[in-house]
């Protein structure tokens, strides 16, 4: 099967794409990136829906969001006042790289067919 490029991803270097895909090796980070893709507003760790559903502690979610930001998939837009003492919650938005990587993942998933292992033939 030949890959048909629908968008121009040349604005991203191979190193940027490799770093982005490497950080997405954790399923929680893919879930987080998807949450940002459907949000119209910046999100903080406590805003990410799977955190409550899966009972993932906020510090763990913050760590994963920070890794996504370091890989260039998210961009911090500043702290949000929580109205309570303590560390302010950082809010993030999806970057162009994050959007493009999600589109590449979606395209790959939509066009891939399950492979049978050589042992099952």
Label for each model-derived stretch:
Residues 1-16, 34-39, 86, 93-121:
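Amphipathic alpha-helical dimerization/coiled-coil segments
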Residues 16-56:
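N-terminal helix-turn-helix DNA-binding core of bacterial DNA-binding proteins
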Residues 39-40, 52-55, 68, 81, ...:
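The DNA-recognition helices of helix-turn-helix-type DNA-binding domains
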Residues 59:
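Key DNA-contact positions within bacterial/archaeal DNA-binding proteins
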Residues 62-69:
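Short, hydrophobic-biased segments on the C-terminal half of alpha helices
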Residues 63, 76, 89, 107-108:
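Short, glycine/charged-enriched secondary-structure capping and boundary segments
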Residues 69-87:
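Beta-hairpin "wing" of winged helix-turn-helix
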């Amino acid at each position: 099967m030949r890959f048909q490029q629908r968008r121009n991803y040349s604005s991203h270097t191979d190193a940027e794409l490799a770093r982005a895909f490497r950080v997405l090796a954790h399923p929680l980070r893919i879930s987080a990136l998807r949450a940002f893709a459907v949000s119209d507003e910046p999100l903080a760790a406590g805003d990410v829906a799977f955190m409550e559903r899966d009972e993932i502690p906020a510090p763990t979610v913050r760590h994963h969001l920070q890794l996504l930001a370091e890989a260039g998939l998210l961009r911090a837009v500043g702290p949000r006042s929580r109205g309570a003492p303590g560390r302010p919650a950082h809010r993030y938005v999806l970057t162009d790289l994050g959007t493009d990587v999600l589109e590449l993942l979606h395209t790959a998933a939509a066009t891939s067919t399950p492979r049978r292992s050589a042992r099952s033939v």
